[in-house]
Amino acid sequence: MLNIDLQYFAQLQDAAGRAHEIRTTSAPTAADLYDELRDVYSFALEPACMRVAINAAFSPWEQPLRDGDHVVVIPPVTGG
């Protein structure tokens, strides 16, 4: 099991009801972690319309996760 430091913004933060959490997971990749989070928080956004950053660097969704990683899922910017 991995302990992942997660940060949420915009509509993801609203859906999760928090901006930050430490989550214990067995997800091997960022994509698998997002699938897990979608099940928990009913996130509506598809990964294809967002970016993921792992340890302050943009990363592919298939990036393997390591214990202690800081993961930020960045939704599209909206507003006017």
Language model: regions and residue ranges:
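Ubiquitin-like/PB1-type beta-grasp interaction modules and other compact soluble beta-rich domains
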Residues: 1-79
